[in-house]
Amino acid sequence: MTILAIDIGGTKLAAALIGADGQIRDRRELPTPASQTPEALRDALSALVSPLQAHAQRVAIASTGIIRDGSLLALNPHNLGGLLHFPLVKTLEQLTNLPTIAINDAQAAAWAEYQALEGDITDMVFITVSTGVGGGVVSGGKLLTGPGGLAGHIGHTLADPHGPVCGCGRTGCVEAIASGRGIAAAAQGELAGADARTIFTRAGQGDEQAQQLIHRSARTLARLIADIKATTDCQCVVVGGSVGLAEGYLALVEMYLAQEPAAFHVDLLAAHYRHDAGLLGAALLAQGEKL
């Protein structure tokens, strides 16, 4: 069965055909509409999928935000603008006349990463550290999404009750500290206004403040991983995202995790897939997993 897989992100929309062999073909990409209106998103999705839909039997969507009853929600509604409650599944079914599923992009990526693992692994957690912090949980060989689509949103667990306010409305979330946005927001002095990429570059050049910001992020993530081990007893944690895969970052996380009691240690792995994990995971789910 060939799946028309779609990835909806904050800056880009991607689509591709993915067969039973897992090969990605005819990949297309468009910018996410800046206007954040339902009409603009529908038009962009139509342009994206129209050349591909005749070659597919199902549609699978991996999207930023929370997917509940086929519609788009978010922990921080302001991130979606006019797209809050956008009917993703219904829209794609109308555009393509194909059966459609939708899932959070980090949950989809977690499923792709799980399928790439070697050995007898039944329980794993995927964490993406990028602009935000997201994740997905596989338990007993099954992806956990939850009845409301919230499962795996581990970036919104508490890291510091006296920390910065997160976009979700809580104070001191992991995302508000460890993410690329969190790293940049904490920069002061000559680093004020710099993005995470610049801060990583400066850290590599020996800038003390930049190094401290990255260590703060890695330490926060290590504590989250210890909490995850305590709550899931997972066999491994896979780390991805632009921050998670930045040079030297995972080694720092491993160093701080080693400082936790041994019961909370767990194998850390770098993500196998990068940009297209959401596309592939959604397609794999559409080919055999009931959501």
Curated annotation (Swiss-Prot):
InterPro entries: ATPase_NBD (IPR043129), ManNAc_kinase_bac (IPR023945), ROK (IPR000600), ROK_cs (IPR049874). Keywords: ATP-binding, Carbohydrate metabolism, Kinase, Metal-binding, Nucleotide-binding, Transferase, Zinc. It is an enzyme of class 2 (transferase). Its EC number is 2.7.1.60. Homodimer. Catalyzes the phosphorylation of N-acetylmannosamine (ManNAc) to ManNAc-6-P. This is N-acetylmannosamine kinase. It comes from Shigella flexneri.
